[in-house]
Amino acid sequence: MFNNLGDRFKDIFKKVSGQGKLTEANMKDALREVRLALLEADVNYGVAKNFVSKIREKALGEEVISGVNPTQQFVKIVHDELVEVLGGTNVQIAKSPKNPTIIMLSGLQGAGKTTFAGKLAKYLRSKGETPLLIGADVYRPAAKKQLKVLAEQVKVSSFTIDESTDVNEICRKGLEEAGKIHATYVIIDTAGRLHIDEQLMGELQGIKDNFKPHEILLVVDGMTGQDAVNVAKTFNEQLDITGVVLTKLDGDTRGGAALSVKEVAGKPIKFISEGEKLDDIAPFHPDRLASRILGMGDVVSLVEKAQEAIDEKEAKKMEEKFRKNQFDFEDFLKQFKMIRKMGSIAGIMKMIPGVDTSA
């Protein structure tokens, strides 16, 4: 994700290096390159234009601070603006003072709602919560079965009514079940469509009106670029969503949706998903992503992944074995398996500052 954009920014920063001051003359070409880089990454035109304008305002005429060269100044300005356009700060998922907290997932068909429901349930379970998955997609034949399988895989409860096509009945009885099992979160997986239509919106509006969800998350396919932004804008206008989830951000995704959705739709990105595994879910932190785009790494996320994947007691045992020269192949294999839990090696490398991952 964002590899091409990151490479473009590196080239731009190299061109700025060696300047004694950030002036209109040496900024003109750099800002033009920034705008082109953003547009090539499928960033919304208006967002790209505003982004460049703000950089120009901050950069032009700034005196070089003692010990900081113009390139470093320019990098900081770009970084700060990236953080802002991505949303500024992390917006956490809602938590109702009275259980359960109800989360409704919405979106078009194929965006990955059902899979994300499983990922979110696993994430919440890892935080000590008790989630219940409700299958309210009554149109896709395999949806309810898929939800049940995912629930079993992540070791949480699920609720569906195979013979019912009444989403309100399913949600009502599902919430009754949530009370019986003392669920702290309820995740409602709704039906998608190939395109936005009145029936889809009417059904979602009905769930919203009848069950008052604390979160209405729109799940969008990050690979669709500008289409994802347009979908987010339309859903927000009709449903007043509380946040966006970007899926499928692995592979060759250009990243335009992530850089545009907050400013265009006016709602924060709350989660991103960069892979197919049920662990591939992360709360969205604008500052961390901005640092990764600019090649600064993301040490905080790296440490968090390590804490989740590495058993502290096991790590202390390994340390003792190292000191006593008793570390063997079986121990090496255990260490390797723990590292594998952190994700792909390529993903880990991207979080380390200064490591070139373009090769």
For the regions a protein language model found, what residue spans apply to each?
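Conserved phosphate/pyrophosphate-binding and hydrolysis machinery centered on Walker-type P-loop NTPases
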Residues: F2, G20-K28, A41, Y45-K49, ...
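Alpha-helical scaffold segments in soluble metabolic enzymes
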Residues: N4, D11, E33, I77-E84, ...
